[in-house]
Amino acid sequence: MRIGLAGIFVDDQDRAERFYTEVLGLQVKTNAAYGPGERWLTVMSPEEPDGVELVLHLTDEPARAFRRASRELGRPVFSLRTDDCQRDADRLKAKGVGFVREPARMPYGGMDAVFDDTCGNLVNLHQD
């Protein structure tokens, strides 16, 4: 077995699609109607075409409460791996991305930085 899909909740699927593709450089894998006013929207890394797809779900009220609590605790909803955390943080900052935690060595190993995805989530940038 392997993980095929993971999902996060976003306030606006159009804005999320722009952020995750134009800013982060991911690619849309699936974009299909999925219920009233919602799409089944997945993005994936162009470096791993058979890798995990990230589903960008439209937020509902229970998800809003979970996201608020996660943000208040400073907990990212997922991590993106990089081979150079500082370089990618600088690149994202140049594109206007706001960081809530600058790149720093972590006690468990590697380097992490945390940024706001503009769609209600914190995302971790991790370097081994």
Give residue ranges: language-model regions:
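Short glycine-enriched loop/turn motifs at secondary-structure junctions
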Residues: 1-2, 70-75, 107
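Structural motif
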Residues: 3-5, 51-54, 75-77, 112
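Vicinal oxygen chelate
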Residues: 4-8, 31, 39-42, 80, ...
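Core segments of cupin and vicinal oxygen chelate
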Residues: 8-52
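Helix N-cap motif at beta-to-alpha junctions
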Residues: 12-13, 83-85
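Short amphipathic alpha-helices within nucleic acid-binding modules
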Residues: 19, 86-91
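A short, acidic/glycine-rich surface segment
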Residues: 38-39, 62-67, 101
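Short, charged/polar surface micro-motifs in flexible loops or helix N-caps
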Residues: 46-51, 60-63, 85-86
